[in-house]
């Protein structure tokens, strides 16, 4: 697996829920957080013309952010950034306070999720182009397939999941860990395996791969249909205390 590169990130995560006044019967059983169709969608807020004029060449980055039940985005992180993508990184991180998503749904109710995706900026025929995909799988990114990877759900009433903490050997240490997960069509994690950790040997991979087996995800969707998924999920560690907890 290619080396994960932690670039620039902002992570002031507040875990809170605001339940909108929506009838559960009007919502599907599962729906991932999606790009909205409003002017404040992430793909509409990123100013591709300005990026080209300021000298941004082809660039790619992966991102994660918290999406609330109101559809607001928070705590954007960017990583695995291609060389020379600094202007794109700054543009993406600067838009998180404005962006709106279509909120996720779990068992017919809106739910907060941790969403991951990829942003690809490229120039073709002298014009800028921007693609925002809600997965980070190499083959799906190459093909541009309609795949929304499973999203970590901040689901209440799941006492088995006790959260993800720093390993005892490295409390408060900045780090990155990637795990390969299998998630079924109910959102249950059926398998997890460490794919990468940096710095190595301090237990960050195991600190994610073990607890995440008890977490709940919004299942993955391919071509609009629920599918079991085998995918890579990345978590960055920084700041003191708990990294991820669902309640």
Language-model features, listed with the residues they occupy:
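Bacterial N-terminal signal peptides that target proteins for export
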Residues: 1-11
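Bacterial N-terminal signal peptides
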Residues: 10-18
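Charge-biased low-complexity segments
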Residues: 22-247
């Amino acid at each position: 697996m290619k080396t994960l590169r932690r670039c620039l990130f902002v992570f002031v995560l507040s875990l809170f829920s605001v339940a909108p006044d929506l009838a559960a019967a009007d919502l599907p059983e599962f729906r991932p957080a999606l790009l909205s169709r409003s002017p404040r969608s992430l793909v509409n807020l990123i100013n591709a013309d300005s990026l080209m004029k300021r000298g941004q060449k082809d660039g790619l980055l992966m991102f994660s952010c918290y999406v609330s039940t109101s559809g607001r985005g928070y705590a954007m992180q960017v990583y695995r950034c291609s060389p020379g993508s600094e202007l794109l990184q700054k543009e993406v991180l600067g838009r998180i306070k404005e962006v709106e998503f279509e909120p996720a749904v779990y068992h017919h109710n809106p739910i907060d999720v941790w969403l991951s995706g990829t942003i690809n900026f490229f120039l073709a025929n002298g014009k800028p182009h921007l693609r925002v995909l809600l997965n980070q799988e190499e083959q799906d990114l190459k093909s541009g397939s309609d795949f929304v990877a499973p999203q970590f759900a901040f689901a209440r009433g799941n006492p088995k999941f006790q959260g993800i903490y720093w390993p005892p050997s490295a409390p408060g240490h900045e780090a990155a860990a990637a795990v390969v997960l299998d998630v079924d069509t109910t959102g249950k994690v059926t398998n997890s395996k460490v794919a990468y950790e940096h710095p190595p040997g301090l237990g960050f991979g195991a600190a994610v791969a073990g607890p995440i087996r008890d977490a709940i995800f919004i299942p993955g969707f391919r071509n609009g249909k629920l599918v079991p998924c085998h995918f890579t999920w990345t978590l960055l560690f920084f700041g003191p205390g708990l990294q991820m907890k669902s309640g």
